[in-house]
Amino acid sequence: MVCDITELKAHDGRKVYLEIIKDLATNQLLTWSISQHPNLQFALDPLQQLLKQLPHTGYQLTLHTDQGWHYQHRAWRKLLRQGNIRQSMSHRATCLDNAACETVFSKLKAEIGPDTSYRNQEELSQAINEWIHFYNERRIQTKLGNQTPLQYEQNLVA
């Protein structure tokens, strides 16, 4: 799994922050958080959601992030330990180490159109949420055998 944060700005100049956790096996965006402030709770929310929905298999998972302060915080690391998740971090100033997230952010920004075309944070946040559901449920991906991430996951467990 990979995790990262991106920033978008509505027409009124106010910012919206998006954090995603992506499953590399299915390309599904497992959890996400949208906020007007990139504070610690914003960063912890998707990880807390992830821990609630992950099945307890006994296997240790790995979650890769950049070296942002959120991911170095003791509260973040404590949640990882509680979920038996191994932390992996990019090298300093090496965004390509987390290309799987950067690609999603690039597609989001291209497909929802210019973030400044949304009048305010609420409109932009709604567009982001709608796009994430589209990405998981309706956006066909060649890498997944021309299936959506959700279809691919369902076929894996079938």
Residue spans for each PLM region:
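Charged DNA-binding/catalytic regions of mobile-element recombinases
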Residues: M1-A158
